[in-house]
């Protein structure tokens, strides 16, 4: 089973992934986008720190995704895979600038049509997002602003709906333990864990 954990920056994905790794390190392959491969680490550095065009950014994300799918997802599709970000957020971010259908086709090409089978979306309200953003330094994506990030969040839901990928929406302003409990429920329901 291939599950994606999605959410905008500061939604708490990384915190949840670390908690899940501690519990399921022997049962789940944990990956992330961008930057899971050596190649991806270089791409991540460029995307978040260099001043590049939206089109160049899109193709860098696609290159990273293609490499991760080819080297880690494809050979392990028979196992449990949990990814911190995926094609869902890739399309959600890019559809602010590019056509949805074109993005789907580019991502199908990059992933050989391998998309997550289920998505967990951590959703933040505007006030919580504003507070959390005020507590950290911003990368190039976060610098695009509050309204941009809220739109991306809505786009993630739209992408799942349009691609007919089942998803669960979780309130990311809840406490860490409650969110973790809900995610573990999904894992126990969808993944074959020993």
UniProtKB/Swiss-Prot annotation:
<comment type="function">
    <text>Phosphorylation of dTMP to form dTDP in both de novo and salvage pathways of dTTP synthesis.</text>
</comment>
<dbReference type="GO" id="GO:0006227">
    <property type="term" value="P:dUDP biosynthetic process"/>
</dbReference>
<keyword id="KW-0547">Nucleotide-binding</keyword>
<dbReference type="GO" id="GO:0006233">
    <property type="term" value="P:dTDP biosynthetic process"/>
</dbReference>
<dbReference type="InterPro" id="IPR039430">
    <property type="entry name" value="Thymidylate_kin-like_dom"/>
</dbReference>
<keyword id="KW-0418">Kinase</keyword>
<dbReference type="GO" id="GO:0005829">
    <property type="term" value="C:cytosol"/>
</dbReference>
<dbReference type="InterPro" id="IPR027417">
    <property type="entry name" value="P-loop_NTPase"/>
</dbReference>
<dbReference type="GO" id="GO:0005524">
    <property type="term" value="F:ATP binding"/>
</dbReference>
<dbReference type="Pfam" id="PF02223">
    <property type="entry name" value="Thymidylate_kin"/>
</dbReference>
<protein>
    <recommendedName>
        <fullName>Thymidylate kinase</fullName>
        <ecNumber>2.7.4.9</ecNumber>
    </recommendedName>
</protein>
<feature type="binding site">
    <location>
        <begin position="7"/>
        <end position="14"/>
    </location>
    <ligand>
        <name>ATP</name>
    </ligand>
</feature>
<keyword id="KW-0545">Nucleotide biosynthesis</keyword>
<comment type="similarity">
    <text>Belongs to the thymidylate kinase family.</text>
</comment>
<dbReference type="InterPro" id="IPR018094">
    <property type="entry name" value="Thymidylate_kinase"/>
</dbReference>
<dbReference type="GO" id="GO:0004798">
    <property type="term" value="F:dTMP kinase activity"/>
</dbReference>
<dbReference type="GO" id="GO:0006235">
    <property type="term" value="P:dTTP biosynthetic process"/>
</dbReference>
<keyword id="KW-0067">ATP-binding</keyword>
<keyword id="KW-0808">Transferase</keyword>
């Amino acid at each position: 089973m291939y599950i994606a954990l999605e959410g905008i920056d500061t939604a708490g994905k990384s915190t949840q992934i670390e908690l899940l790794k501690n519990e399921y390190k022997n049962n789940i392959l944990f990956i992330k986008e961008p930057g899971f491969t050596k190649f991806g680490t270089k791409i991540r550095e460029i995307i978040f720190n260099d001043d590049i065009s939206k089109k160049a950014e899109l193709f860098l994300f696609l290159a990273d995704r293609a490499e991760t799918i080819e080297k880690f997802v494809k050979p392990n599709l028979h196992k449990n895979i949990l990814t911190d970000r995926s094609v869902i957020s890739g399309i959600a971010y890019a559809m602010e600038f590019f056509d949805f259908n074109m993005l789907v086709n580019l991502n199908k090409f990059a992933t050989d049509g391998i998309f997550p089978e289920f998505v967990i979306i951590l959703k933040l309200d505007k006030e919580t997002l504003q507070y959390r953003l005020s507590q950290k330094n911003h990368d190039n994506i976060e610098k695009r602003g509050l309204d941009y990030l809220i739109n991306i969040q809505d786009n993630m839901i739209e992408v799942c709906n349009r691609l007919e990928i089942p998803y669960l929406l979780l309130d990311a302003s809840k406490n860490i333990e409650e969110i973790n409990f809900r995610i573990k429920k999904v894992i126990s329901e969808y993944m074959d864990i020993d």
